[in-house]
């Protein structure tokens, strides 16, 4: 099994700039009468972004049952944090550095840093 894509609903076009700062590139755009669908890609990961100001705002707290957040792996947290406002960098249970940020509509997005292991020299997540 593999992940095909992640679908997001955003309230305005300006949200695309956030994902572009993470390295996503717009690949296709479909203008429909009631919304716009933008397909963005970064390193083989596809985002399907629905731009529609008529959807209700996300319930932000307390968190409800369902999807909690999405996480992207980046080369360098410091590099991303030059362009994107994030929380402080922390370390998870496995020793990986991570942080959280939000797009302009506010859903939490986790950023994890790629890490080289001295044992095998290969990158892992």
Tell what function each PLM region has.
Residues 1-2, 62-67, 93:
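Short glycine-enriched loop/turn motifs at secondary-structure junctions
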Residues 8-47:
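Core segments of cupin and vicinal oxygen chelate
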Residues 1-16, 68-70, 120-125:
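N-terminal beta-strand motif that seeds the catalytic metal site of vicinal oxygen chelate
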Residues 81-125:
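Vicinal oxygen chelate
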Residues 5-7, 39, 69-71, 98-100, ...:
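Short, conserved structural micro-motifs that define repeat-unit consensus positions
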Residues 63-88:
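Mid-chain, well-packed structural core segment of small domains
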Residues 35, 54-59, 119-120:
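A short, acidic/glycine-rich surface segment
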């Amino acid at each position: 099994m593999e992940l095909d894509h992640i679908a997001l609903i955003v309230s305005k076009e300006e949200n695309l700039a956030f994902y572009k700062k993470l390295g996503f590139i717009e690949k296709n755009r479909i203008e429909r009468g009631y919304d716009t669908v933008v397909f963005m890609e970064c390193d083989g990961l596809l985002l399907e972004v629905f731009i529609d100001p008529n959807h209700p705002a996300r319930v932000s707290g307390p968190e409800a049952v369902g999807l909690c957040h999405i996480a992207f792996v980046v080369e360098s947290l410091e590099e991303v944090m030059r362009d994107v406002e994030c929380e402080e960098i922390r370390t998870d249970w496995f020793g990986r550095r991570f942080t959280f940020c939000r797009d302009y509509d506010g859903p939490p997005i986790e950023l994890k840093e790629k890490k080289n292991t001295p044992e095998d020299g290969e990158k892992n997540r």
